[in-house]
Amino acid sequence: MSGPPTSAVVESRLVTSTSRVSTGVAQLDAMLGGGLLPGTLTVIYGATGIGKTHLGLTFANHGRTADGAPGLIFDMNGRGDSQQHAEYAERLFNWKLGEWTHTVPPMSEPYPSPEQMAAYYSNAFKWVGRVRDFQVPTPDGSWEFDWNWKATYNQSLYAVRPFLYFHFGAGTRRIVVDGVEPMDSPADSIQFHMFDELYRKTIHRDAETLGMEICLPVWQHREFIDAHRYPHTAITTLLLVTTEETRLEDLLARKVATGDIGATANTIVVLGSERVGSRLARMLCVVKHRGSAMSDEIVEYRVTDRGFTLG
């Protein structure tokens, strides 16, 4: 005889096609027909300094109100120049991000401390450049990832996978991935490769399966795994991609290259600048929003001490 439905099953029933995920910016939600669709991927394109990080932090912080838990900030920046996530979060939202450092090697104690459960920022993937930079030739003339790099990358997953799993199990339903650099051919980008792996194999992996892979031996942690199941179809992802183009017109004319995540994303928003009289204005436009009505307007926005505002 089956027992009562778990909280994850109940929540998944509530995630219907009419559900919406608020960005935290009411005017942008209106342009998106009420908000983002739950469980989907949204890509924000724009040049460095245009306001992508502010928009991402606004989205993540809004999880505190909308979901009962803030979103995660996964920073893929590998250049060493801080994008000031912690500073912005504290100044704009009085939110102390905290950095996740907890790792769970196989058969080790999996559970993070209360302090780590209050940490919503990770910068565990610090590799940038071309995929080929991390590969070596094989005897048959093809290429494969260098074993030393693979070992280091797999080691980083001992931090990344628990970062997502334990926070999703505690109620987080949104994640912002920042720090993705421009690349002539996105298919050659190591950052796009790692994001694709993260998105398919961790963010949208069955919660029970992910828990069984992290919490070993399973028999010892079965009660925790069962009690912390969550519907991965409710996790909404915002990917912030830096572009070489700065003008909105150039971004709107930008072609989707082979391997570009935007080709498979549900929603695309572009942020660019345009000359308005004697000043340079920042403009926003929704380019794609599958499964929903959307505005075709080009709207001015500002990034101020109060954060990201439209109009």
Please tell me what each predicted stretch does:
Residues 22-35:
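Pre-Walker A adenine-sensing motif
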Residues 75-183:
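Conserved inter-motif catalytic segment of the P-loop NTP-binding fold
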Residues 183-194, 206:
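Conserved ATPase-coupling elements of RecA-like P-loop NTPase cores
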Residues 50, 181-187, 246-249:
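Short acidic, S/G/P-rich loop/turn micro-motifs used as interaction or catalytic elements
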Residues 1-15:
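Charged, amphipathic alpha-helical linker segments immediately N-terminal to NTP-binding catalytic cores
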Residues 190-197, 253-259:
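Charged helix-capping and loop-helix junction motifs
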Residues 211-307:
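Phosphate-binding/switch region of NTP-binding enzymes
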Residues 34-108:
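Walker A/P-loop NTP-binding active-site region of P-loop NTPases
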